[in-house]
């Protein structure tokens, strides 16, 4: 979670005024287009805290927005904190990224970090995209792929490693698709933005404000293209390129992570980039023992570089660099524990399956093994962490048929919104 978006929210949202107005709900099939309000027990559990002052409900929408005759529905979990301020501006919602991350699980986090002046001026809406968190239905019986790191030391045959990883992920993706034939085709941003529009109508908002982080920028961008009159303001952080394909993502990730690494190493002082380079030069030839745990260059890279874009964690990353450096070059020096552990969130099996299905539903032009290997090898000369990330992203669609794509072709032209969108950290930020 980056605090940068919250500054942008303050800039982007205090623009104009939006008062609530009535809307006519779309034609409903049974309860389609309506919200069933109920207790917040499940939402509190999902959020990991009591959502005081929130109303909790479930929005019913068609599973297949392209065929409303299909009787199957999806249930979208939604919570709302209604402002009582006489200076109410409108409604604010968000998507925290992923794909596969629950908005309800991040409701308290976002609400706490948003400046009070902003939060109290809006009805605040959090929701779980279809297939995520409390929303139903969900993917079932999807194996979790577990790919090994490349060789601990020495040169890497990137094509061989990518082939191995591709086969492992393919062996998980194929049964996931087979076990979810009635759901997987209806997961993707194409459907999410239609659910989002149905939610706006059901909540009786003439317009609302959207902030999207990481993958949430894809949701916000395509929602703005499809429903420009439904948005008052749009704030995108760590934004994906609207021209993104599954293959061009490899180059974008390489550039973004390398840029983020450059920013990080330029700030903590001259000794940090020198230490970092010396660490990885040494780890190319041997592993390191830290606090009784043996780690390879890949484990160290994964720990450090996954959080490079987060300036909030710079101090902890510097501390961990010093610990690894001393373990390698000053083994007799007493180990000083970091002031706080690096918080690398684990990705659940469901989140990983959703990530693969949604990205491969959204993005065309799946990369080949040779393309992934070439991109990873090129990145490895400057950043091992970037190389690992490229392989991870590149094999997303292993095992998916080429015609699984059902989203939007790379965009051309500009968004046409009354208020210009605020886009932050679109370069040098992989998140």
PLM regions: where:
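Catalytic-loop region of hydrolases
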Residues: 2-7, 21-163, 276-279, 405
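Bacterial N-terminal signal peptides
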Residues: 8-16
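Glycine-rich nucleophile elbow surrounding the catalytic serine of serine-hydrolase chemistry
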Residues: 102, 194, 212-224
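A catalytic-pocket lid/entrance helix-loop region that shapes and gates access to the active site
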Residues: 140-151, 220-275, 322-332, 339
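Conserved acidic catalytic loop of the alpha/beta-hydrolase fold
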Residues: 175, 179-182, 193-207
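Alpha/beta-hydrolase fold active-site neighborhood
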Residues: 272-418
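Acidic catalytic loop of the alpha/beta-hydrolase fold
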Residues: 311, 428-431
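Short beta-strand/loop motif that positions the catalytic acidic residue
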Residues: 417, 423-425
């Amino acid at each position: 979670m980056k605090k940068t978006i919250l500054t942008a929210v303050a800039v982007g949202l205090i623009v104009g005024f939006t008062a609530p107005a009535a809307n006519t709900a779309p034609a409903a099939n049974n309860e389609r287009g309506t919200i069933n309000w109920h207790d917040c027990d499940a939402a509190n559990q999902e959020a990991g805290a009591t959502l005081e002052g929130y109303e909790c409900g479930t929005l019913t929408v068609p599973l297949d927005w392209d065929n409303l005759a299909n009787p199957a529905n999806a249930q979208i979990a939604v919570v709302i904190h209604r402002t009582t301020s006489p200076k109410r501006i409108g409604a604010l919602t968000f998507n925290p990224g992923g794909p596969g991350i629950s908005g309800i699980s991040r409701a308290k986090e976002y609400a706490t970090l948003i400046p009070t002046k902003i939060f109290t001026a809006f009805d605040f809406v959090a929701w779980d995209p279809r297939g995520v968190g409390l929303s139903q239905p969900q993917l079932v019986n999807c194996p979790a792929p577990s790919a090994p790191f490349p060789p601990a030391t020495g040169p890497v045959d990137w094509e061989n490693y990518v082939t191995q990883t591709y086969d492992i992920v393919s062996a998980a993706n194929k049964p996931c698709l087979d076990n979810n034939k009635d759901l997987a085709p209806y997961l993707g941003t194409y459907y999410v933005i239609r659910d989002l529009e149905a939610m706006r109508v059901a909540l009786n908002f003439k317009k609302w404000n959207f902030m999207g982080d990481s993958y949430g920028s894809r949701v916000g961008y395509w929602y703005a293209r499809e429903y420009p009159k439904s948005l008052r303001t749009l704030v995108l952080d760590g934004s994906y390129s609207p021209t993104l394909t599954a293959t061009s993502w490899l180059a974008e990730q390489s550039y973004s992570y390398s840029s983020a690494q450059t920013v990080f190493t330029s700030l903590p002082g001259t000794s940090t980039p020198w230490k970092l380079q010396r660490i990885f030069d040494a780890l190319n030839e041997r592993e390191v023992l830290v606090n009784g745990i043996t780690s390879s260059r890949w484990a160290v890279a994964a720990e450090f570089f996954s959080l490079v874009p987060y300036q909030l964690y710079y101090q902890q990353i510097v501390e961990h660099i010093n610990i690894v450096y001393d373990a390698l070059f000053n083994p007799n020096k007493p180990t000083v524990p970091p002031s706080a552990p690096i918080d690398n969130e684990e990705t659940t099996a469901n989140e990983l399956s959703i990530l693969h299905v949604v990205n491969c539903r959204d993005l065309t032009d799946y990369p080949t093994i040779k393309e992934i290997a070439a991109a990873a090898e090129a990145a490895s000369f400057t950043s091992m962490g970037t190389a690992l990330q490229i392989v991870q992203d590149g094999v997303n669609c292993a095992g998916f048929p080429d015609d699984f794509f059902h989203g939007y072709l790379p965009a051309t032209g500009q968004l046409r919104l009354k208020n210009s969108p605020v886009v932050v950290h679109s370069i040098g930020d992989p998140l």
